[in-house]
Design a protein with these regions (language model features):
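Small-residue hotspots at the loop-to-helix junctions and early N-terminal turns
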Residues: 63-74, 149, 153, 216, ...
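Helix-terminus/linker motif at the lipid-water interface of multi-pass membrane proteins
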Residues: 45, 49-67, 136-143, 201-210, ...
């Protein structure tokens, strides 16, 4: 019996990684979650490794370099917000069309999403490249940090298009049920970046490398390769999504529908990432460069464990979209509740790791005693609310996948801007908590978001949304 289950388990893993497109409107729900979640978890896990490897190599360049990466990543989350918002809209629309068996409209929707993304990417790139100094100054960077890091910031903003397309096209493939192809594109991007990082930063055989700018260039090259792989498979036409040149003719009905879903989804993450920018600034103002460095190391580790959990959340989004398209509402809800259970279990294990192993985790990235102290403190406090975070992220993504992107936006606004930021400011400035106050505001807000999102999801408004 045990041997049979082991064989079945590895057979499912092989099937999940093969890259076949599945009809998730029928069959065992646990199997459907597994087939979708495994490649999504592996996809985002390697993205997490990529973020940590980046911080490991950059960390050897000193406090200023760590701070620059932290400041820039905080600002780049605005681009991530746009990318994830467009990706969320694409996943919801394409999953619904696939559930309805309308693959031609699914392909046209994918092409329209690519056009919309191109316009926004150009605008973000121009703004970031021109105003890199001012953006770093706004984040609270010192004169020395700005001088050392402005080129890094320019390069990262200049590559906005590859960031947006990498996320968007993966959302398209996930909506079509091909999570494995999305995984492979991010693997390509991450592996190339990991190989190029030390070469471009430190050099080789007498070449001194590009230092901090080398880290940015390695990231751009890696992501560019991932996008090239995605585009190849989109135009190859062997799967559900078969994009033709005629699909790029503007279809204003689809564009309107896409934007109606994308702008709330984008603002969800703008609201969330904007609050993180304010929190980053608050930490810098309260504790200086050492506090910023410790906090950024902690956040990179938080991201390392949160991104795999997003794999389960994204699986819920695809399942709810396809099953609503097939008019199987009960199956859609059961899929979400099962994914929520699995995510809560996973995040409870992560919480234990952060509480008991934070010291060796942070020490791996730096030898600075003060940076380690602050990083450990941040990891332990922020990690204490991870069970609720796991529940909340599935609820929010499920509503997004159903096409109800406005409700999670309102929840995010209340949780982050009416609770987290005011609470963090009060605790750091007036309560005597100091830096700890900024850290405690995070799990408190995330717990509130999870409770509210769960309650609203169970009310069932998402069942009536048309996309």
């Amino acid at each position: 019996m045990v041997a049979t289950n082991i064989v079945k388990f590895f057979s499912l893993i092989k099937e999940a990684l093969r890259g076949d497109e599945h009809d998730y409107t029928q069959g065992n729900i646990r199997t459907a979650i597994f087939l979708l979640a495994i490649p999504m978890i592996l996809e985002l896990s390697l993205e997490s490794v990529f973020a940590l490897v980046d911080m490991f190599f950059v960390g050897k360049l000193g406090q200023n370099a760590i701070a620059v990466v932290g400041y820039t990543e905080s600002m780049i989350t605005i681009i991530y917000s746009l990318a994830i918002g467009l990706s969320t809209a694409a996943t919801a629309i394409i999953a619904r069309r696939v559930g309805e068996k309308d693959t031609e409209d699914a392909s046209t929707s994918a092409a329209q999403a690519l056009m919309i993304s191109g316009v926004f990417s150009v605008v973000l790139s121009v703004v970031g490249v021109i105003y890199s100094d001012e953006l770093l100054r706004f984040m609270g960077a010192s004169v020395d940090v700005i001088a050392e890091g402005k080129s890094f910031t320019r390069i990262m903003f200049g590559s906005s298009a590859v960031i947006v397309y990498l996320f968007l096209i993966n959302g398209i493939f996930r909506g079509a049920g091909n999570a494995a192809l999305a995984m492979k594109s991010l693997w390509i991007a991450s592996i190339i970046n990991i190989i190029l990082d030390p070469l471009f930063i430190y050099g080789l055989y007498g070449w001194e490398g590009w230092g901090l700018e080398g880290a940015a260039i390695a990231t751009c090259v890696g992501r560019g390769a991932g996008v090239a792989y995605q585009v190849f498979h989109m135009v190859k036409g062997s799967g559900i999504i078969k994009i033709k040149l005629s699909d790029f003719t503007p279809d204003w009905k689809i564009i309107k529908s896409m934007l109606q879903l994308a702008w709330p989804a984008t603002f969800q993450f703008v609201i969330a990432s904007g609050s993180w920018i304010v929190l980053t600034r608050l930490v810098a103002d309260t504790g200086g460069t050492a506090a910023s460095a410790g906090y950024q190391i902690a956040i990179r580790n938080v991201v390392f464990f949160i991104l795999p959990a997003w794999g389960l959340s994204n699986a819920a989004a695809t399942l709810i979209g396809q099953n609503l398209g097939a008019n199987q509402v009960d199956r859609a809800e059961k899929s979400v509740m099962l994914a929520t259970k699995y995510n809560a279990i996973f995040m409870s294990m992560v919480m234990a790791i952060f509480i008991f192993l934070s010291q060796p985790i942070v020490s791996f990235f730096t030898n600075d005693a003060e940076v380690i102290r602050i990083g450990v403190q941040a990891l332990q406090i922020i990690g204490s609310g991870f069970i609720f975070y796991g529940i909340g992220m599935v609820m929010m993504q499920a509503m997004n996948g159903a096409g109800d992107t406005k409700t999670p936006t309102v929840i995010n606004f209340v949780g982050f801007w009416l609770v987290q930021i005011p609470l963090a400011y009060f605790l750091t400035q007036y309560s005597g908590f100091g830096l700890e106050g900024a850290f405690w505001a995070v799990p408190i807000a995330e717990t509130l978001i999870a409770v509210v999102a769960y309650y609203i999801f169970k009310q069932g408004r998402w069942k009536t949304i048309k996309v």
